[in-house]
Amino acid sequence: GFHGDHHSLVIDQPEAEHYRDVPEASAALVPLGALVGARSGDKGGAANVGFWVPELGDGLADLRYSWFESWLTADRVKDLLPEADPLGIDLYRLPNLRAINVVIHGLLGRGVAETNRLDPQAKGLGEQFRARLIRLPSDLIPDIALPLSEDVV
């Protein structure tokens, strides 16, 4: 089955421009939502979050996606959402859409009727992720510079 594995789906994808690694000193502290949009929901006991990098008209969307695609891993999802730590996480990468779909198996227990989560259908989960502060290369999000904190993912 697919549970617990990591998957990528690439169909007729042109070679993407890849973002280089940047030194920590050139990173800015921003909410994840400054980089991506998100929509989330449920499918049985699994929570589903779709992230996408929008086109902002500055020509950096492909580079932002390249950085985000290398940054977002199952372990990073667990860092951003600690209650997902013991759960299976699948990542489905959709480069043509500059999007990544994340499935967190078992986050909702056996489903909406049997979970005690405050957000039983995971409708707010995408915004919960978008509110988390991350270190982003400052040249990908211009004019944002906050002092870095040690407790940032």
Please give the residue ranges for each predicted region.
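C-terminal amphipathic alpha-helical interaction region
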Residues: 1-47, 111, 116-153
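C-terminal non-catalytic interaction/assembly regions of soluble proteins
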Residues: 1-23, 27-30, 43, 47, ...
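Generic detector of well-ordered alpha-helical segments enriched in charged/polar residues
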Residues: 33, 65-69, 78, 130
